[in-house]
Design a protein with these regions (language model features):
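Pocket-lining segment of extracytoplasmic ligand-binding domains
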Residues: 1-66
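Segments of small-molecule ligand-sensing domains
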Residues: 49-196
Length: 196
């Protein structure tokens, strides 16, 4: 996750464009050729001036295999995805999902209308900045247009691909929250650590 304040973005549009271009290019590099560059990324990240952790530990999640416990290594090419599946695109529906989890677990103590989730997501996620950077990366010859979801309205299609199998539609967050078996529901509030 990479975020900037609205003030910084407004005052530094060229820097924001350059940063976003760099993040897109790095994400493409990490995922291209079946993750072929991940071993080099692991070595870079292991350096003391960056993460400074043991390269073998970083490699566990970065190189397409994961060791769940001693001796239990499994192929997991999508354990970390940086660019595939439009992973870098700032979908409003992703922001709305985070907000639904905050509401579900009481970090947002009171009901919010579906429109509040949409407005909040749109106040933070800026696909127009991302699209401008993607177009610049394409113009620079470092990507192809078909690699990007330029037609996106900011919302992914409804999906039931989460671990619980519950269908999530970012355009109907309250229906999603109410469909979950545990967590706060419509009409419930949190006050003084108690659910009312």
């Amino acid at each position: 996750v990479f975020g900037l304040t609205a003030q910084f973005a407004e005052e530094n549009p060229n820097t924001v464009l350059a940063l976003t271009k760099a993040l897109i290019r790095a994400a493409i590099w990490l995922d291209e050729n079946d993750n072929a560059n991940r071993a080099e990324a692991v070595e870079i990240l292991a350096r003391p001036e960056y993460v400074g952790a043991d390269a073998a530990v970083i490699a566990n999640s970065m190189t397409g295999t994961f060791e769940y416990e001693a001796g239990d290594k499994r192929a997991a090419p999508d354990f970390n995805v940086f660019f595939r599946y439009n992973a870098t695109f700032p979908y409003y529906s992703d922001a709305v999902w985070y907000l639904t989890q905050m509401r579900r677990w009481g970090q947002i103590a009171e009901d919010k209308a579906d429109g509040w989730y949409d407005e909040t997501a749109k106040s933070v996620y800026k696909p127009e900045l991302y699209k401008a950077a993607a177009e610049a990366v394409i113009a620079d010859g470092n990507a192809k247009a078909e690699m990007f979801d330029f037609d996106a309205d900011g919302y992914r299609e409804p999906t039931a691909e989460f671990i619980d199998g519950v269908t999530y539609d970012g355009k109907t967050p309250n229906a999603y929250i109410d469909s979950l078996t545990i967590g706060l529901k419509t009409g419930q509030t949190v006050s003084g650590g108690a659910v009312n």
